[in-house]
A protein has these predicted regions:
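Zymogen propeptides
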Residues: 44, 48-52, 56-188
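C-terminal motif of bacterial Sec signal peptides marking the signal peptidase cleavage site
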Residues: 35-38
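Bacterial signal peptide processing site
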Residues: 40-42
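Extended C-terminal subregions enriched in glycine
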Residues: 208, 234, 250-346
Length: 346
């Protein structure tokens, strides 16, 4: 498939499009909550709290949601392979307690290759980082595991990192982008009807549509990333997936561009899907094939789509999206936009 010619958009700050044939990527990230790396003494962590929500014009049907809970560490179990090798999947990273990352590749009807990288629930936890420019923090003191660069302590646990959602204030009209909360601080008001990746203070994750039975009453909300209504709801592709304009402005107005997305399956594995030239429907199909129950689009356009993985915690990082613009160590040195880290645990 040839990439559509792309030009600079006034709303999304992308670079020139990739000139290579794009290959789709899906990262499946296991979401059991375990302790996030300790914060620096100079940056106290805010306690989880109730958040304020706003209501956009359209209403959306709530999808099924899946929540992962923190594993008890009071009586550690002996190391055991909790995730056996599966036919058709290749082990990428193995921890003493089991396979943390494995991969599977398939080809879409249009010929594009889709690679699924699966991070297994119970073996990883997560942290949401702000960028140096977006979202604006207004000088809020944030812990080390929420800042624009990955610190040394967090790096020692790092298995993967991937880009966040749309720039705050950008996106489709009238659906809006959504809000964001980081380390207990609401940076942009959270919006009802927007798909939400929610992290608790231990790094456990869940996903659902905000304000439609999600998050459940009493849930400990520590960080939230929202982007658009669901791309996948109840294990089914959104009926609006064919309306490409509803999924963000592309460079030059073409249909094909770099896109990314994140979802969660019934086992609590989190899925990240991306390609440097694709349609929203391609991402949705790949996520559903990988077992996604709920999923949302993340950022689009070539400058912002990025995922990196390591074979072992703290090991050398490799780019996971073929032909992505940014180097594999970009998040280590710091980045302008928000991103999520995937850390080994416990």
């Amino acid at each position: 498939m040839l990439m559509a010619r792309q030009h600079l958009s006034a709303r999304l700050h992308g670079r020139r499009p990739a000139r290579h044939r794009a290959v789709s990527i899906v990262l499946a990230l296991g979401m059991a909550g375990v302790a996030v790396a300790a914060c620096s003494s100079s940056s106290p962590v805010a306690a989880p709290h109730n958040v304020t929500t706003t209501t956009p014009r359209p209403a959306h049907t709530a999808p099924s949601t899946t929540t992962t809970s923190r594993r008890s560490t009071a009586t550690p179990s002996p190391p055991a392979t909790t995730t056996p090798e599966q036919p058709g999947w290749t082990v990428v990273s193995r921890l003493p307690s089991g396979i943390a990352v494995d991969s599977h590749s398939s080809r879409r009807s249009n010929g594009d290759l889709v690679t699924v990288l699966r991070f297994h629930a119970g073996l990883v936890h997560y942290a949401l980082h702000v960028g140096s420019i977006d979202p604006p923090t207004d000088g809020a003191a944030l812990p080390a595991v929420a800042r624009p660069a990955i610190g040394a302590r967090e790096h020692a646990q790092l298995l993967a990192a991937f880009n966040g959602g749309f720039k705050m204030g950008a996106g489709c009209i009238p659906c809006g982008v959504g809000g964001m909360e980081v380390a207990g601080r609401v940076l942009f008001p959270l919006v009802r009807g927007m798909t939400s990746l929610v992290l608790n203070q231990s790094g456990g994750a869940s996903m659902g549509v905000w304000g439609q039975g999600f998050p459940p009453a009493g849930a400990a909300v520590y960080s939230v990333r929202q982007t658009l209504p669901p791309l996948v709801s109840g294990g089914r592709v959104s009926p609006n997936v064919g309306d490409v304009s509803a999924w963000g402005a592309t460079l030059g107005g073409g249909l094909l561009t770099a896109r990314s997305s994140v979802g969660i399956d019934a086992r609590g594995n989190v899925l990240y899907a991306a390609s440097m030239s694709t349609l929203p429907s391609d991402l949705a199909d790949a996520l559903v094939s990988a077992g996604a129950v709920t999923a949302m689009e993340l950022d689009i356009n070539p400058e912002w789509v990025q995922a990196d993985t390591a074979r072992s915690p703290g090991g050398p990082l490799r780019t996971a999206v073929p032909y992505q613009y940014r180097p594999a160590d970009q998040y280590l040195s710091g980045w302008t936009r928000d991103f999520v880290t995937v850390l080994s645990g416990p």
